[in-house]
Structures are given as structure tokens and as C-alpha cells.
A protein has these predicted regions:
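Helix-coil boundary and N-terminal low-complexity module in membrane systems
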Residues: 1-111, 118-222
Length: 222
């Protein structure tokens, strides 16, 4: 009985992880409400989940706001760039949709390809910012480089990120609503945590062996 209630019990370890992801998810969502701070919030979330995967996490809230503060400037600039590019892509898709004939279809395919690139960049750029010191230009360039070089991992992370869309195919409104609420409570944190298993494997390839585990690596261009 004592062993069952031990904090080292796998069940309690799992539940602690779930609780941490719920807390992390809610903090991230709250800090994303002023859209301009979303970049810093997502970066901070990945800072924590990357540590969780390495079993280095201590205080979720403290670690989150440490990264939020340290990376705020760069993350905000990158976020504004991503918002601007996303807005342009949205307008381009609408223009292509309203174009008559085959020209509209061709442009629609072209712009959808750019949307995929945009989404892949989104998957990598904030985790890279959370893990490496670098310039904004090199952070974006390295995000594209890693996404292409580690394409199998990229495909898996894309599929993980698209999993919430499965909610649209659930016929029962009650089940759909329940899962949607559950996703709002911990969904983004779970996605970041799952992606972090792959990101840790990727990032380890670019980390100096002698680097202290508590610090980011100095931003060598990969």
C-alpha cells in the first residue's frame, strides 16, 4: 500500500506530468492573449517541455517566465514577422480562390505549398529560439535547415500538430465538446511535449559535448 502511494509510483509520476502540462498550457494560453506576446509565450512553453523531456524541469512557472523574459525581444520580433507573413499568405489564398480558370488552381497549389513551409517554420523557430542563442536571421534560417535535414521527424511533428483537426470528424457533439475543452486545458502543452522528444534528438546533434546542461549553447550557425 505504501508503495502505491509513493511519489515514485508510475501512476503518480504520470499524473504529476499531466498536471504540469495543464499548468504550462494554461499559462501559455493566457500569455498569448495579447497576440504580440504569443511568440515569447510559445518559446517559453518549449523551453519548459524540452527540459521536461530531459527530466531537468524543476519549477514549471518559474522556468516559463524566465524564458519568457530572456527571449521576449527576439521572440516578439519573430512573432510579428510570422503574423505578417501569415496575413500575406491568407490574402494570397483568397485572391487565388477568386481567380477564374486553371490559373486560380495553379496559384492556389503554389500558395498552399508556402503555407506548408510556413507551418513547418512555425514548428521549429520557437523551439530553436528556446534552446540556442543566435540572431533572428540565423534562427529562421536554421529552422528551415533543420526542418529539411530532419524531414522524417518534421513529418511526424506536422502530423502531431494536425491531430486536433480530428475533432471535426467526431459526430457526437457531447464528445466533441468534451474533447475540445480537454484540448484547451492541456492540448498545446501536450503537442509541445510530444514534439520535444524529436526536437531534443535533433538539437543534440548541434550541441557542443562540453556544454553545461543548464545553459544554452552559444549560437553557432548550423
Amino acid at each position: 500500500m505504501g508503495r502505491f502511494f509513493s511519489m515514485d509510483n508510475k501512476f503518480f509520476t504520470f499524473m504529476n506530468k499531466v498536471a504540469d502540462l495543464c499548468i504550462l498550457n494554461i499559462i501559455c494560453l493566457v500569455c498569448c492573449i495579447p497576440i504580440v506576446t504569443a511568440g515569447a509565450s510559445i518559446t517559453a512553453m518549449y523551453y519548459v517541455t524540452l527540459k521536461m523531456v530531459r527530466n531537468e524541469e524543476a519549477y514549471i512557472v518559474r522556468s516559463f517566465f524566465k524564458s519568457f523574459k530572456d527571449n521576449f525581444k527576439q521572440a516578439t520580433i519573430i512573432n510579428l514577422i510570422m503574423i505578417a507573413v501569415g496575413a500575406v499568405l491568407y490574402l494570397d489564398l483568397n485572391v487565388a480562390k477568386n481567380m477564374p480558370g486553371s490559373a486560380g488552381q495553379i496559384f492556389h497549389v503554389i500558395f498552399m505549398a508556402f503555407v506548408i513551409i510556413y507551418y513547418v517554420l512555425f514548428l521549429y523557430v520557437y523551439p530553436i529560439l528556446a534552446r540556442f542563442y543566435n540572431t533572428i536571421r540565423n534562427t529562421i534560417k536554421n529552422a528551415l535547415f533543420m526542418a529539411i535535414r530532419h524531414l522524417p521527424y518534421t513529418v511526424v511533428m506536422v502530423l502531431i500538430g494536425l491531430c486536433p483537426l480530428l475533432l471535426l470528424f467526431i459526430c457526437s457533439y457531447q464528445i466533441q465538446s468534451t474533447l475540445f475543452v480537454l484540448f484547451l486545458v492541456m492540448g498545446f502543452g501536450v503537442i509541445a511535449y510530444c514534439n520535444s522528444f524529436f526536437l531534443v534528438k535533433i538539437f543534440d546533434l548541434y550541441m557542443p559535448k562540453e556544454e553545461n546542461e543548464e545553459q544554452k549553447s552559444e549560437g553557432t550557425e548550423v
